[in-house]
Amino acid sequence: VIIAIYLLVLLFVLKVSYFDVFNRRLKDYQPVYNEIIKKHPDFKHHPYSYINNDNNKIQGEFYYYDLDHYHGLIINAHGMDNCKETQLARLEYFARNGYLIYSYDNTGVGESEGKNIVGLGHSVIDLRNTINHLATITALQPMKWALYGHSWGGYAVSCVSNYQLDHDISAIISKAGFNSVYDEFYFLGSQKFGKLTKLFVGPIMFFENLRIKENKHKQSVDGLDKTKANVLIMHSYDDPTVGFSITMKKYFPRLANKENITFKFFQDRGHVIDQNINSLGRYYSQHADKKEPHYQQHYATLLVKDMDHQLVLEQLHFLNKYMI
């Protein structure tokens, strides 16, 4: 009886913890676009939304420079506690070098509808829906397409080839993406609870699978193994948010010898690989809970100012190799 009571209490605590994280909207607004156009006034944007399978409006933006020709379309999938503008300094650089960009807010984030963010696995559902909707736009159909994602978005771009996609994908860049929802929950839990985490992950996955039936048992390694796209996987050994070892333990046996997949590893770049992690990380850790406009504006300034231009240039070279 005591054990049964203990298990019920544990299940209740885990349920409350899970819903505390995912039964909410993310209202982050990071005004990166306003920061960028101070230096690049010709960088334009055009709002574009669609209605997803759950009858929620997914709000995105096309970002571009007026050009006679675009090398292709890059679809950006954002990370957790981020929004469609978080990666915009990098996306502007790609746009400046000939690409059309589409970036969107996930369900329950920013300007998109949805009463909550559903669950950790929902980012790949949002990406699949976005790809298949954009595939109906005649002007985009002849273009080559690339996927670009960090963290939650890195998982999405890696995993999405498990689904039926209505347009071919030529290139994928995944930065600090995790292999599966289970692996990510396990890694985050093990940092606090060690091996006891095994007791928690099963019930948490039960709640996750109740909310996202379409994503049950989906892994990035399966999507990457299936895709014909050329893939760049970037990850740092010291990533505190998405475990390097737990991810590569799944990736390497199946992907290391695939000609279309390139790995690029770092020793000390943390979770945000192509950013000056010292200034950005310090500021975010001090002000993560502050949503006032002046804090968000300063964070946006750092996102633009402290971008690692050399690493973003390497990403551009990868895109150009397979998109032009």
Model region roles, listed by residue range:
Residues I2-I51, I58-Y63, S285-Y299:
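An N-terminal hydrophobic leader/cap segment in hydrolases
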Residues L91-E113:
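Conserved alpha/beta-hydrolase
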Residues I117-T138:
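Alpha/beta-hydrolase active-site loop
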Residues C159-E214:
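Hydrolase active-site cap/lid region
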Residues K258-I324:
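C-terminal catalytic histidine-bearing segment of alpha/beta-hydrolase fold enzymes
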